[in-house]
Amino acid sequence: MSKQPSLSYKDAGVDIDAGEALVERIKSVAKRTKRPEVMGGLGGFGALCEIPAGYKQPVLVSGTDGVGTKLRLALNLNKHDTIGIDLVAMCVNDLVVCGAEPLFFLDYYATGKLNVDTAAQVVTGIGAGCELAGCSLVGGETAEMPGMYEGEDYDLAGFCVGVVEKAEIIDGSKVAAGDALLALPSSGPHSNGYSLIRKIIEVAGADIENIQLDGKPLTELLMAPTRIYVKPLLKLIKETGAVKAMAHITGGGLLDNIPRVLPEGAQAVVDVASWQRPAVFDWLQQQGNVEENEMHRVLNCGVGMVICVAQEHVDAALNVLREAGEQPWVIGQIATAAEGAAQVELKNLKAH
């Protein structure tokens, strides 16, 4: 009778040694992001973090997100060094719009077969994103799950917690007719609309690795990491106290994201002619024959963040943002919505 061979976890497709090697590789990344409130290092069962000093009535704000199918493009291009920045950006930009300062971040990395080099690149990007946002990378989960993912394909999720003073929560309730809308530029499509983007590339049969737009490779424009707006916006809030609402322009574009922070009866009137749309969006529209309204419903079209302030604070707000290295502009204003009108009106839409 044949003796059954002794099976190990590695035989089943899970390499514990690889997981431990990854942890060693990323300890220094986490250390660089450490805030004074964080207690202990990586490797514990749970991460501990004190509330920063100076808050009277601190309110915790949490968020979770992924990077959508931009990840598929990253895998296809074998480019893993900035997708972690995207992951952090998608979470922290959602927190800062209510006035919150991000405190700590955790990530979830799931794969069929762990490639330590790839995972280390991803986590290094996450660390870079945390540094840009001023939050600590306090832990995460690396799950090697054979049979769940194809080969070394992986998926990502991020989780972030921030804090805001209860009396200073920004919720859009003070937005009023006549207020101004300011915009901050995006770096490209950020992390939204990539299912449409990939479909356009497929239908057009475009060799994106050999196309240049404005002197830059198209792949670079499509993979440009999502901008992290935390530090300029926190500076704006602290120095002016004038911010009434902010909208992170993600999936759904201007049309779906601005209404999330508008009170009933308010309408945002946005002048599409107030900025030059980056070439990557024009290329996508042309190659996919995408209708103008659909462009603004799916993609950010060059606008990453919209900020509402009273008219008398416009100049001060623009100055503070410029001091912080931003290139803001006035994109529109708040009006009283007519009966049955949409909450966002796009003016000067170009004919398609």
Curated annotation (Swiss-Prot):
<comment type="pathway">
    <text>Purine metabolism; IMP biosynthesis via de novo pathway; 5-amino-1-(5-phospho-D-ribosyl)imidazole from N(2)-formyl-N(1)-(5-phospho-D-ribosyl)glycinamide: step 2/2.</text>
</comment>
<keyword id="KW-0067">ATP-binding</keyword>
<dbReference type="GO" id="GO:0005829">
    <property type="term" value="C:cytosol"/>
</dbReference>
<dbReference type="InterPro" id="IPR004733">
    <property type="entry name" value="PurM_cligase"/>
</dbReference>
<dbReference type="GO" id="GO:0005524">
    <property type="term" value="F:ATP binding"/>
</dbReference>
<keyword id="KW-0436">Ligase</keyword>
<dbReference type="GO" id="GO:0004641">
    <property type="term" value="F:phosphoribosylformylglycinamidine cyclo-ligase activity"/>
</dbReference>
<keyword id="KW-0963">Cytoplasm</keyword>
<dbReference type="InterPro" id="IPR036921">
    <property type="entry name" value="PurM-like_N_sf"/>
</dbReference>
<dbReference type="GO" id="GO:0004637">
    <property type="term" value="F:phosphoribosylamine-glycine ligase activity"/>
</dbReference>
<keyword id="KW-0658">Purine biosynthesis</keyword>
<dbReference type="Pfam" id="PF02769">
    <property type="entry name" value="AIRS_C"/>
</dbReference>
<dbReference type="Pfam" id="PF00586">
    <property type="entry name" value="AIRS"/>
</dbReference>
<dbReference type="InterPro" id="IPR016188">
    <property type="entry name" value="PurM-like_N"/>
</dbReference>
<protein>
    <recommendedName>
        <fullName>Phosphoribosylformylglycinamidine cyclo-ligase</fullName>
        <ecNumber>6.3.3.1</ecNumber>
    </recommendedName>
</protein>
<keyword id="KW-0547">Nucleotide-binding</keyword>
<dbReference type="InterPro" id="IPR036676">
    <property type="entry name" value="PurM-like_C_sf"/>
</dbReference>
<dbReference type="InterPro" id="IPR010918">
    <property type="entry name" value="PurM-like_C_dom"/>
</dbReference>
<dbReference type="GO" id="GO:0006189">
    <property type="term" value="P:'de novo' IMP biosynthetic process"/>
</dbReference>
<dbReference type="GO" id="GO:0046084">
    <property type="term" value="P:adenine biosynthetic process"/>
</dbReference>
<comment type="similarity">
    <text>Belongs to the AIR synthase family.</text>
</comment>
